[in-house]
Amino acid sequence: MLDHNEYPTVSGDYPLTDEWAVTLPSTFQTKIEDEDLVIWKSGLTIWCSVWDIDYGETQQDAMAWVVEEQAEKAFDVHQTEKDGLIFYRYRLFEETNDYSVASVYCFVFSHSSYIQLGIYVDDEADYAQAIEICESMTFINMAVLH
């Protein structure tokens, strides 16, 4: 469905790729920018990037690289496992939003790929919704095996 701005609108369970899906708590708009999927609504923007995990590499190997490369000023670091997936996230104050509200970086690792969600909120009150979106990620192509 296209809105007045000619961007598709999505809500609820939404497949991001052939392998990954997210549950969106309300209506968002979508577009492709710089080869990434961008999902947004007023006050909240999500940038989605997906990478393959190399043959012979494990979820833990891929996550170790992300942890090693994360910004030094990352805080509120959280890791959990659910349904065979590893969820890893942290927050970071950035120039993007004038250092006023910390962004949320969420990574979810399957056996064959991982997805990064960079979630930018304009108001701290939207932080809970950003976490809800991170935790809703699902891997929908369990047939992909190394």
Annotate each language-model stretch with its function.
Residues S42-T45, W51-G56, F93-N97, F109-S112, ...:
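Short, flexible beta-strand-to-coil junctions
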Residues V66-S112, Y120:
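Signature of long, low-cysteine stretches enriched in small and polar/charged residues
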